[in-house]
Every structure is written in C-alpha cells, then in structure tokens.
Amino acid sequence: MKIHVVVLSALVSWAPFVVAQEPAAAPDQESVQNVGPVRVFLDCRTRCDFDFIRQEIPYVAWVRDRQDAQVHLLITRQQTGAGGRENTLAFIGLQDMASVSDTLLQVSSPTDTDSEEREKLTRTIALGLIPYVARTPQAAGLDVSWTEPTEFELEAVEESDPWNSWIFRLRTSGSLGGEERTKDYSISTSVSANRTTEDVKTEIWTYGRYAESSFELSDGSTTTGLRRDYGASLLQVWSLGDHWSIGGETSAGHSLYGNYDLRAWIAPALEFSVWPYIEATRRQLTFLYALGVQHSDYIEMTIFGETQETRPAHSLFAGLSMNEPWGNATVGLEAFQYLHDPERHRLELFGRMNVRLFRGLDFNVSGHFARVKDQINLRAGEATDEEILLRQRELGTDFRYGFSFGLSYRFGSIFNNAVNPRFEALD
C-alpha cells in the first residue's frame, strides 16, 4: 500500500499555514540508511489526538520514551490574535538522525472544528517527518504531491479584512442542580473584543456572575450562600522591539465576596523579555513593572474604618517558562505594595515542573506560597460560622499555600503504534 502525503497550498486561507523557521539539514552522503521505520517520540504539550495521529501516519514507529527515539517531536501552542491556535512543531533529531532538525508552524482558524484542527496538525506532522522517512526503506512507499489552489481560493486570500483584525466573543452559561435538601444555580456571561497584531494588542473584557446555593439544616432552617461579581477591563500593549513592550491596564468591578461595591484600578506598565518574544513557545523570561492608583468603595466598613479610599500602588512580576526535551517548567514571582503604607504588601511565588528523570520515570511538582499583608478591604467584625463555611466573605490571613507532586514509571514494550478503541467506556 502506498502512503500519500498531500501538501495543500499555503495560499488556501482555511488550510494550515506552515512556515519552516529553521531549514532542515540536507541529507549527507555519510548518512546511514535505517533498516526499519523511523522511531518517533511524540511529546505534545497541548491538545493532540494521539490515536488519530498514529492511524494516519503508520509508516513510522511511535515509541513511548525519548531514549528509544530517533526523532523527538515537541509540540507547543499559543493563541493567535484572531482567536485561533498556532502550534510550534520542533523536530529534534536523535541518535543517527541527530544532524536533522527542523521547526514548523501550523496555524488553525478560530472557526475550525476539532476534526479540522487535528487533520491540519497531523498533516503538518507528516510534512515534518519526510526528511527522516526519506532516509529509511519506508521512503520507497512514500509519494509527495501538491494540490494547486483554485481561482476562488486565491481570491479569498487576497480579500481585505473588513473587521480590521478585531475579534468579538459573546459567552453565557448557566447551571442548575440539587437534591432533597440542597439546591444551587448559577449564571455567568462575558463579552470581549480583542485586536492583536505584531505591534499592538488590545483586549476589552466585561463579565458578570451570579451564584446561589441553599441548604436545609437539621433544625428545619435554611442557609443560603450568595456570590455576585461583575466588571470590565481594558488592556493596551505596544511593541518596542524584540525585547520591550509598553502599555497599561484599567479595570473596574464589583465583588460581594471581596467587600467591593466598586473597585477601580489604572496602571501604566513596562515589560522586558530576556529572550526575543518570538521564542515564547519554547522559552520566556520576562519582567513587568506597573505603577498605578486604586480607588475602592466598600460595601461595609473595613477593619481600618474606611468606607472608601484611593491609594497608589505598584507591582513587579518576574516569570520564567520553558518547554524543552527534558520537560517543562514555569516559575513566577509577584510583588504588590501600597505606597501609602509599605507594610501593606503581598509577595507570591508559584511554579510547576514536569521532568523526565530517566527512561520511563516522570516527575511532576507544583506549588505556590504567598505572604499576604495587603487586605485593606476586609470587613470589620467577626465572620459567622455560616460565612466561613459558605465562603461568603474574604477572611484575614497572613499566608496562602498549596503543594502537589506526582511520580509515574512506565516499562515494557517501547512501541506504541496500535490503536484499539473497544470498551473505552470501561477503560
């Protein structure tokens, strides 16, 4: 059976846009032909349909561990300005294929279905594997063909954008549930308008949420819990080159839980990226500083005797994220401080990491810790037991923390080509 890899024209607006960032090294005369199919380790850091990929690309050997692979395929994702997704596919040659490495981009439309997304991603994977398959006996059964775009498709690409890159989203959701002595319901909605180009990013967001839960107690009385939040925000960012950005954020909102009848915040900000922004899908180290003013109208008097106040504040955020063959890691440190009283501050450290320690052994850890000294919004008076149990009001604390870890070990056959969907309901 011949395997055909069909390359659709990049001019077709609904087809995946594929760009080779680092051209693959050309096969040299000293390359040794493999006696079997190329062994590929699929390392997908986003949403991938593994079964579909294995079914559509059967002419390589899919292995479960990087140590057994000749090709490490690392896939990462980021969102595009139009609301679609840009997948970065890094083909990393190993062992006798170490001289062949490449990076491809695949872009999907925000209107693509899950089926269309997986087909486009799988097609791009097949394209990227061609230089490796060409060095094996499987190349004899591989044809590469090109489908010429129609006149209609060419005209569609040249058509101007009447929306000028603006994307609008309307969302609403609700839930209802209960038992004999409990019931709850909630409704939420949001409206957003985003525009993203290489030089400017604008994000406008409005939201609202209402949730209510009621419980019948043993004495026949009923306790009700209520959550109500709504607000709006604007983020504006301008590019200052490959490493710098300038912008600002303004927001206003209401929070019953946080004791805010109105909380308004405005702050200009400056960000520096150690590595060029174009490398963000693989590695990113950024520092962001913001200086602003917060105005608060409180629902109830605070523990400091305030019903409203306006305070200057500043914040600093440092974040590192990496997606590498050994695994991925994200670490962030955020500091916030009110300038009228430096003792009112918050310092938070968080991170997560997934690491392949050695063949078959994976380790993951995540956690966060915060020193909390900035709760100027707390209601005066003691919280009742009902308010504590139902989380009806923000409680005073000096710290918050959380930690989790996991360890997994796999062993056995190195191959992973078979697909068997039977009895999945019991799997």
Q: What are these regions, as identified by a protein language model?
A:
Residues 158-165, 198-201, 239-243, 258, ...:
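Short loop/turn motifs that connect adjacent beta-strands in outer-membrane beta-barrel proteins
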Residues 174-178, 197-199, 208-214, 250-256, ...:
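Transmembrane beta-strands of outer-membrane beta-barrel pores
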Residues 164-166, 183-187, 226-230, 262-266, ...:
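Residues that define the transmembrane beta-barrel architecture of outer-membrane proteins
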Residues 366, 396-427:
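Outer-membrane beta-barrel "beta-signal"
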Residues 181-186, 215-221, 259-266, 297-305, ...:
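Outer-membrane beta-barrel translocator domains and adjoining extracellular loop/strand segments
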Residues 35-40, 158-178, 199-204, 285-293:
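Transmembrane beta-strand segments of Gram-negative outer membrane beta-barrel proteins
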Residues 170-172, 189-195, 234-238, 268-274, ...:
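Residues on the lipid-exposed face of transmembrane beta-strands in outer-membrane beta-barrel proteins
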Residues 166-170, 202-204, 246-250, 266, ...:
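Transmembrane beta-strands of outer-membrane beta-barrel proteins
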